[in-house]
């Protein structure tokens, strides 16, 4: 299968997987126009849409795409049922698309019903995990998001993390503010800065590398613990995650 990213709005990415026959899967189409343009340019035949959550910049293009291609099956969590979803899926279930099984993983935090889709090596994680960061807590709690990130971090090392936004540079600036002397973070920041200076995409990322540079996945890391302990003593990794998320919200 081939993985494609379609830019939308200011910083969204709509992901498309296509097979050799031209059948394709579309993930979180917030805007129909760039997707329709890509379909026409590549002669794709849309088979399915995956929705991760109900926010408009992820679902806004569904109606127009389904009108154009009525055969499309739209998978999504319960919270997207009024956004065009025709097949509601939940944690532990699978979606069989393009000849592959995609596992559905519940990842509450950004929204209460947020889900991710995984079929090795592809992880479509919406607004749960970003490179160098994680989603804001609009509906869920820090505890929920911490548990959700733990689920994703436990996936295989070679997982390709397909996030829905180009937030990597700002996330790495935050990471440097927390761990300014970390070699992995500094190296990755320089790489990302160069890519963005050329207006190039920083995604997808390999999960093994992401675990090294994403402070939200390093809550049991001794260097991070020492930094947090300079300000406040927090015994549990979940508490350290909440501290980080609060810091990022104000960054």
Curated annotation (Swiss-Prot):
Pathway: Secondary metabolite metabolism; methylglyoxal degradation; (R)-lactate from methylglyoxal: step 2/2
Reactions it catalyzes: an S-(2-hydroxyacyl)glutathione + H2O = a 2-hydroxy carboxylate + glutathione + H(+)
EC number: 3.1.2.6
Highest taxon of source: Bacteria
Note accompanying the cofactor annotation: Binds 2 Zn(2+) ions per subunit.
Gene Ontology BP term (one): methylglyoxal catabolic process to D-lactate via S-lactoyl-glutathione
The protein's role, per its UniProt record: Thiolesterase that catalyzes the hydrolysis of S-D-lactoyl-glutathione to form glutathione and D-lactic acid.
Protein family according to the UniProt entry: Belongs to the metallo-beta-lactamase superfamily. Glyoxalase II family.
Quaternary structure and interacting proteins, as annotated: Monomer.
Protein name (record): Hydroxyacylglutathione hydrolase
């Amino acid at each position: 299968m081939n993985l494609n990213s379609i830019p939308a709005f200011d910083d969204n990415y709509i992901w498309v997987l296509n097979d050799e026959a031209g059948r394709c899967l579309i993930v979180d189409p917030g805007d129909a126009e760039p997707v329709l343009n890509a379909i026409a340019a590549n002669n794709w035949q849309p088979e399915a849409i995956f929705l991760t959550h109900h926010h408009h910049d992820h679902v806004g293009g569904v109606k127009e795409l389904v009108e154009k291609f009525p055969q499309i099956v739209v998978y999504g969590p319960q919270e997207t049922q009024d956004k065009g979803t025709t097949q509601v899926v939940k944690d532990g279930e699978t979606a069989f698309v393009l000849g592959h099984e995609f596992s559905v993983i519940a990842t509450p935090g950004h929204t209460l019903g947020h889900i991710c889709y995984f079929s090795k090596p592809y992880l479509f994680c919406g607004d749960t995990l970003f490179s160098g960061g994680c989603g804001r807590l609009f509906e869920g709690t820090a505890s929920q998001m911490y548990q959700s990130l733990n689920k994703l971090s436990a996936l295989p090392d070679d997982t390709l993390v397909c996030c829905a936004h180009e937030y990597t540079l700002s996330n790495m600036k935050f990471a440097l503010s927390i761990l300014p002397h970390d070699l992995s973070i500094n190296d990755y920041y320089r790489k990302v800065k160069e890519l963005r200076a050329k207006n190039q995409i920083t995604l997808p990322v390999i999960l093994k590398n992401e675990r090294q540079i994403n402070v939200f996945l390093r809550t049991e890391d001794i260097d991070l613990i020492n930094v947090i302990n300079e300000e406040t003593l927090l015994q549990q990794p979940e508490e350290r995650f909440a501290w980080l998320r609060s810091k990022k919200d104000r960054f």
